[in-house]
Amino acid sequence: MEEFVNPCKIKVIGVGGGGSNAVNRMYEDGIEGVELYAINTDVQHLSTLKVPNKIQIGEKVTRGLGAGAKPEVGEEAALEDIDKIKEILRDTDMVFISAGLGGGTGTGAAPVIAKTAKEMGILTVAVATLPFRFEGPRKMEKALKGLEKLKESSDAYIVIHNDKIKELSNRTLTIKDAFKEVDSVLSKAVRGITSIVVTPAVINVDFADVRTTLEEGGLSIIGMGEGRGDEKADIAVEKAVTSPLLEGNTIEGARRLLVTIWTSEDIPYDIVDEVMERIHSKVHPEAEIIFGAVLEPQEQDFIRVAIVATDFPEEKFQVGEKEVKFKVIKKEEKEEPKEEPKPLSDTTYLEEEEIPAVIRRKNKRLL
């Protein structure tokens, strides 16, 4: 049997405690075809991980004790060891950078690593996790500020909100299971990209297509759905285009997509056409869609749809029960007049760029 090898070099870097945990989970799950790295300022946390490639940063500034929930310390730690980071990124085609936002190392160091990767010509995708609502508005404010920096430093980014875990299952999740679900998002995103690139296909999709879709793509959605039976097309598309784990959670309005369909050999062309029509109806009318198709001879009455969607006209985030929209300001656009900002509360979140630093400090004192 012919063995297919991934022609592109993909690395996954977990930054800080949350990001490193996600990468460690991938290592324990035995993901293949990628190199895994955990980067942290906290030596004790690194020692608990099984992933082989563990890198300490910021020894001088943190003495191995962590960043103390201060993003500026995490940033300084990354800059202290920038040569070490560049060495890790050498000979890389694509990098996923995973970080939990709202703390110190992930929030501060991840944007530095992403910026370095992008400057080296590497396709850079950030996978960022926002904190639970019960962690308070101050941590969320810090996380959103870190996300802004990460957005500017990456080609594309995927945002997960911890509070959305409860939407994944009807059963009661344990704490361990809940965080496993969060960690699995990174794994599924990486597996999705690698499977698209290396799987022999009737209509092939290669790494150049992945780059076309994700490069400078901004907010991204990666969805996958499977279906069988009479309603298989509806089921597969609905699962693929709606991702409750992810912020934005819909492909509506996307202007760049990569769609791969796996089908059993008994599936008629009409079903594939129906799937693509349904996807077309949900995205921008002039969206650029790269299409791939894979036959699954061992399956029967089966269809799977994988979608990578980017280049959205507006970024939508769900924070607690409030939807917050972040307008994507293009260079040719002008910002609309700003309203007088209001103090933050546990139920109200303002756009980070709309709050002057002096007001933010005042609001923090009011809390």
From Swiss-Prot:
<feature type="binding site">
    <location>
        <position position="183"/>
    </location>
    <ligand>
        <name>GTP</name>
    </ligand>
</feature>
<dbReference type="InterPro" id="IPR045061">
    <property type="entry name" value="FtsZ/CetZ"/>
</dbReference>
<keyword id="KW-0717">Septation</keyword>
<dbReference type="GO" id="GO:0005737">
    <property type="term" value="C:cytoplasm"/>
</dbReference>
<dbReference type="GO" id="GO:0003924">
    <property type="term" value="F:GTPase activity"/>
</dbReference>
<keyword id="KW-0547">Nucleotide-binding</keyword>
<dbReference type="GO" id="GO:0043093">
    <property type="term" value="P:FtsZ-dependent cytokinesis"/>
</dbReference>
<comment type="similarity">
    <text>Belongs to the FtsZ family.</text>
</comment>
<dbReference type="InterPro" id="IPR003008">
    <property type="entry name" value="Tubulin_FtsZ_GTPase"/>
</dbReference>
<feature type="binding site">
    <location>
        <begin position="104"/>
        <end position="106"/>
    </location>
    <ligand>
        <name>GTP</name>
    </ligand>
</feature>
<dbReference type="InterPro" id="IPR024757">
    <property type="entry name" value="FtsZ_C"/>
</dbReference>
<dbReference type="InterPro" id="IPR008280">
    <property type="entry name" value="Tub_FtsZ_C"/>
</dbReference>
<keyword id="KW-0342">GTP-binding</keyword>
<dbReference type="GO" id="GO:0051301">
    <property type="term" value="P:cell division"/>
</dbReference>
<dbReference type="GO" id="GO:0000917">
    <property type="term" value="P:division septum assembly"/>
</dbReference>
<dbReference type="GO" id="GO:0032153">
    <property type="term" value="C:cell division site"/>
</dbReference>
<keyword id="KW-0132">Cell division</keyword>
<dbReference type="GO" id="GO:0005525">
    <property type="term" value="F:GTP binding"/>
</dbReference>
<dbReference type="GO" id="GO:0051258">
    <property type="term" value="P:protein polymerization"/>
</dbReference>
<feature type="binding site">
    <location>
        <begin position="17"/>
        <end position="21"/>
    </location>
    <ligand>
        <name>GTP</name>
    </ligand>
</feature>
<feature type="binding site">
    <location>
        <position position="139"/>
    </location>
    <ligand>
        <name>GTP</name>
    </ligand>
</feature>
<dbReference type="Pfam" id="PF12327">
    <property type="entry name" value="FtsZ_C"/>
</dbReference>
<dbReference type="InterPro" id="IPR018316">
    <property type="entry name" value="Tubulin/FtsZ_2-layer-sand-dom"/>
</dbReference>
<keyword id="KW-0131">Cell cycle</keyword>
<dbReference type="Pfam" id="PF00091">
    <property type="entry name" value="Tubulin"/>
</dbReference>
<dbReference type="InterPro" id="IPR000158">
    <property type="entry name" value="Cell_div_FtsZ"/>
</dbReference>
<keyword id="KW-0963">Cytoplasm</keyword>
<protein>
    <recommendedName>
        <fullName>Cell division protein FtsZ</fullName>
    </recommendedName>
</protein>
<comment type="subunit">
    <text>Homodimer. Polymerizes to form a dynamic ring structure in a strictly GTP-dependent manner. Interacts directly with several other division proteins.</text>
</comment>
<dbReference type="InterPro" id="IPR020805">
    <property type="entry name" value="Cell_div_FtsZ_CS"/>
</dbReference>
<dbReference type="InterPro" id="IPR036525">
    <property type="entry name" value="Tubulin/FtsZ_GTPase_sf"/>
</dbReference>
<feature type="binding site">
    <location>
        <position position="135"/>
    </location>
    <ligand>
        <name>GTP</name>
    </ligand>
</feature>
<comment type="function">
    <text>Essential cell division protein that forms a contractile ring structure (Z ring) at the future cell division site. The regulation of the ring assembly controls the timing and the location of cell division. One of the functions of the FtsZ ring is to recruit other cell division proteins to the septum to produce a new cell wall between the dividing cells. Binds GTP and shows GTPase activity.</text>
</comment>
<dbReference type="InterPro" id="IPR037103">
    <property type="entry name" value="Tubulin/FtsZ-like_C"/>
</dbReference>
